[in-house]
């Protein structure tokens, strides 16, 4: 008897509004509607399928099993007329494709191509280093009043420092003459090379203002002549200092034995930065120092005003203001390291969802903006940069900020099926730690206070351990990957879900303004996983707590 194995999932994603799902398998690709759930389009042999909202335009990339379906070829398809609009071939395999109503962005391993989606004209090319995971995000809002940004991880930077590499954090600032110079804006025809700490812009051997670099060279020669006189004077001083340097060399050896570097420099690799690129002006705007470790996931909000990031460690999630680069929220996803698969903002920027290898989806509420000084804003070190022996780890990992306390004035909903001893202990620990947060924040220094202000999740739910999807596409170590998105706010009849609404809680603040007092406003959260399952959960925006599973479908057998 032959066993009919389900196809391997190569790609799965939501569209910009979360109303549709695109999935590509070895057997082809399909487009599903989320509400009501159902398939409405399918074709074969594609590895990437990107939608433009709910329009008939699709950007697809071949699976590579046939010459006509190369992984280097991007094809724009009109699903209404079943016609090919255009095809573009690139020098290497395509890792990701992102679209909004003005721009199309294609990510290769070491290049990013930006097109005008209206006429498919190439506007700009960005040279970068290897981005194997295809981590990239663009803002999707079609409104001209909203920002249109591209965000992607910055290439690693190697810097020389007297501080040993195992003692460094991500907020080291190296004073250099080049850092004080202001870079000119980029021309749309220029390429951007992010190398080291500077942005190199070259166009036909001329500077951006069109003047030849030779004029600048003449001025530099005059400065060099003046500097020669100073160098001669310095040589005399250096000769006098040779004797004292010999004495310092013997002292530096003793410092090196104790782990402190004296005069020798060490090379430090600086990771965890994110580059913001303006898709309208075609200019990079800033580099945000997000984490100490490499970036694992990032996303821009729908209106392009917020950026959320997570590192490979996965314990801390940070949210930044795109205009200023300031860190405005810091959330603690968990205590133990895990791989974060995706981050997603709600359309109104009130919630942020994170999926990870732990199979628990965490929802954070973006309420009161965190008050940070300029020094604290640069203090983006992860938890392991502090000595856990100096801090009660049970208190630190469970503290919540005042912004969460107000939103949890009502007891959150608790799913009785998830009741465990560990959850009971964690809940009591969180209640005690919230009461101590204010006092501890005043006692500990600034670096520790930055950790104390990290907020825990507002709501969460655990994905089912088994599903009916049957897909065999998994992540590293056999983990099932998942991505999330928020739907539009809906109204539900509370009498149909007594396990959520009828637990003796005061729900009058969440009752709709309509005449029917049973209607409740709820926030849908949609999840698709690499095993071929689609989950539809709802979140109580006032109480939080455990989310309720409304429906579940297989996107492979439908």
Curated annotation (Swiss-Prot):
Residues 176-264, 400-432 are annotated as: Disordered. It is found in: Preautophagosomal structure membrane; Vacuole membrane; Endosome membrane. One of its GO terms (biological process) is autophagy. A motif (L/FRRG motif) lies at residues 331-335. It is a peripheral membrane protein. The keyword Hydrolase does not apply. GO terms for cellular component: endosome membrane; phagophore assembly site membrane; vacuolar membrane. InterPro entries: PROPPIN (IPR048720), WD40/YVTN_repeat-like_dom_sf (IPR015943), WD40_repeat_dom_sf (IPR036322), WD40_rpt (IPR001680). Residues 188-201, 253-264 have a biased composition (Polar residues). WD repeats lie at residues 4-42, 290-330, 335-374. Its main location: membrane. Residues 210-252 have a biased composition (Low complexity). Keywords: Autophagy, Endosome, Membrane, Protein transport, Repeat, Transport, Vacuole, WD repeat. Pfam families: PROPPIN. The N-terminus might form a beta-propeller domain involved in specific binding to phosphatidylinositol 3,5-bisphosphate (PIP2), leading to the association of the protein to the membrane. The L/FRRG motif is essential for the cytoplasm to vacuole transport (Cvt) pathway, for the recruitment of ATG8 and ATG16 to the PAS in nutrient-rich medium, and for its recruitment to and dissociation from the PAS under starvation conditions. Component of the PI(3,5)P2 regulatory complex. The PI(3,5)P2 regulatory complex regulates both the synthesis and turnover of phosphatidylinositol 3,5-bisphosphate (PtdIns(3,5)P2). Necessary for proper vacuole morphology. Plays an important role in osmotically-induced vacuole fragmentation. Required for cytoplasm to vacuole transport (Cvt) vesicle formation, pexophagy and starvation-induced autophagy. Involved in correct ATG9 trafficking to the pre-autophagosomal structure. Might also be involved in premeiotic DNA replication. Belongs to the WD repeat PROPPIN family. This is Autophagy-related protein 18.
